[in-house]
A protein has these predicted regions:
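Generic N-terminal leader/targeting and pre-domain segments
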Residues: 1-73
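Basic, polyanion-binding surface patches
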Residues: 249, 254-276
Length: 276
């Protein structure tokens, strides 16, 4: 099977949402370093676990790959087609073991942006998704349903108190450390600095933290002509003259109002066409 060239994989990686938003390191060597650590921890989890996987959803994906020849073919080919660059996934078992470990951990802050991985599953699949086999694989409903169950498993962990271990005051890797406080302007949020874990009950509780009423007032509140994102995040792109419909598919260049607004009535849609 022909491998995707290194330059093409790198170009896809640099255009990925994770890199542009700062959730994945721009330097791919940082991604490789993360994989090396995850692989070691995943091997330890597998050794402790014994036969099978720690998470049933990962075991179900393993069973799907074993019993569905089409899924197995595309998974194997997608991994093989990344071999022109740093092969961060060695084989199917390695992919499953890394997934199994990811489901039992929360994203750690890292003051060094070259080593920061805040989207672990995106980090795992970013190269596979750039390959011809990967593009076919991630369109297969059985594979996507299996991944959905894995994401739900991981979400349950992130909603649990077990995920609070990353909410610490470490200067370099703590979400409540001085570096993170400055970078993410945590003083603007409702945080109980006297309580353990800042008073948060889980990583997701911290991730969805409340902004203090006196900070960042909402512009255009009550004005139906304005759409304001309620999320606190990184601006991905500012676009003008957006059309009613466009080929956009993968967060690249064009945006489609019809799709972003979930097929609204024509009158509402036209209010935003080519708006600035």
């Amino acid at each position: 099977m022909t491998s995707v060239t290194g330059p093409l994989l790198d170009a896809h990686y640099q255009r990925s949402f994770g890199v542009l938003a700062g959730y994945l390191p721009e330097d791919r060597s940082g991604l490789a370093a993360w994989h090396a650590v995850i692989r070691e921890k995943a091997a330890q989890l597998r050794n402790d676990q014994g036969p099978g996987y720690a998470n049933q959803a990962v075991q179900d994906l393993a069973n799907l790959i074993d019993t569905n020849g089409i899924v197995r073919m595309y998974v194997a080919e997608a991994i093989d087609q990344t071999s022109a660059f740093m092969k961060n996934i060695k084989n199917i078992q390695d992919m499953l073991e890394q997934l199994d470990f990811i489901c039992t951990t929360a994203p750690e802050y890292n003051v060094n942006k070259k080593l920061r991985v805040l989207f672990p599953m995106s980090a795992l699949f970013v190269d596979m998704m750039a390959t011809p086999a990967g593009k076919a694989l991630f369109r297969l409903e059985p594979f996507n349903e299996a991944l959905r169950a894995i994401l739900q498993t991981w979400a349950a962990y992130l909603d649990s108190q077990a995920s609070c271990w990353v909410l610490n005051r470490d200067l370099n890797i703590g979400w409540l450390g001085t570096a993170a406080i400055a970078e993410f302007k945590l003083a603007d949020f409702v945080i109980d600095w006297d309580a353990e874990y800042g008073g948060f009950q889980s990583y997701n509780d911290f991730f969805h933290r409340e902004i203090q009423a006196s900070c960042r007032p909402l512009a255009g509140e009550g004005d139906a002509n304005i759409i304001t994102s309620p999320n606190d995040g990184t601006v991905y792109r500012i676009a003008t003259d957006v059309q009613q419909s466009a080929v956009f598919w993968i967060k690249e260049q064009s945006y489609s109002l019809q799709d972003m607004l979930a097929n609204p009535d024509a009158a509402l849609l036209q209010r935003f066409v080519e708006a600035r």
